[in-house]
Design a protein with these regions (language model features):
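A residue-level marker of the well-folded mature domains of exported/periplasmic proteins
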Residues: 1-202
Length: 202
């Protein structure tokens, strides 16, 4: 059994969101209210509140991993509710598209964050970053262990930032350098073993 500790990268995206918001409201399009997703939203919240204690996180659940029309409707509702950071835990880039259109068409100061893959091309002007997986490193480690005879069954592998299993997607072109530097410095601190694997929950 193996998995990536996505909450680590979510915490970092939360810091970026907390630094970027002007309304102190982050809107999340949630896939399913299951433990993994709730944990990730909690990590986002903790990251944002670590730099901005006035943060409020609002979630609309669409009960789907991929449903672009529902995703779009939820993102628009969150935007109308005063959330100026749109975040998603689904596999659709709809929140990125909504943020881009709201800024270009209506001049709204709204930003977006992606999920699981680089989504910035879907709305480059208003994209911050997002959490993404690097499964190739996990598979390489397992294959190497089999090849060298060191693979062991019946174990649980939890891999995170230090093992490059989770990461941040490329920063958006309009994200202030101060925000990027702050988040990257905290990430480096994590990689240097100054935080344990279960931070911020430990």
């Amino acid at each position: 059994n193996y998995g990536c500790m996505s909450y680590q990268a979510r915490f970092l995206t939360g810091i970026a969101a907390g630094l970027m918001t002007k309304t102190n409201r982050i809107g999340v399009v949630g896939s399913y209210p299951i433990p993994e997703i709730v944990r990730n939203i909690n990590a986002l919240t903790l990251g944002a509140q670590s730099v901005n204690p006035n943060i409020e996180v609002n979630v609309i659940w669409i009960n789907s991993w991929f449903d672009p029309p529902k995703d779009m409707d939820a993102a628009k509702a969150l935007l109308d509710g005063g959330n100026d950071i749109l975040y998603t835990t689904t596999d659709s880039p709809s929140v990125v598209v909504v943020a881009q259109k709201a800024w270009k068409r209506d001049g709204k100061e709204v930003w977006s964050m992606g999920n699981d893959a680089p989504m910035g091309l879907n709305g480059p002007d208003r994209y911050i970053t997002g959490m993404m997986f690097h499964w190739s490193g996990v598979y390489k480690q397992l294959v190497d262990e089999v090849a060298t005879g060191t693979w062991k069954p019946n174990r649980r592998m939890n891999l995170g930032l230090k093992q490059n299993c989770v990461a941040l997607s490329p920063w958006g072109i309009n994200v202030p350098g101060k925000v990027v530097n702050t988040v990257e410095t905290i990430k480096t601190t994590w990689l240097d073993d100054e935080y344990d694997d279960f931070y911020p929950f430990s």
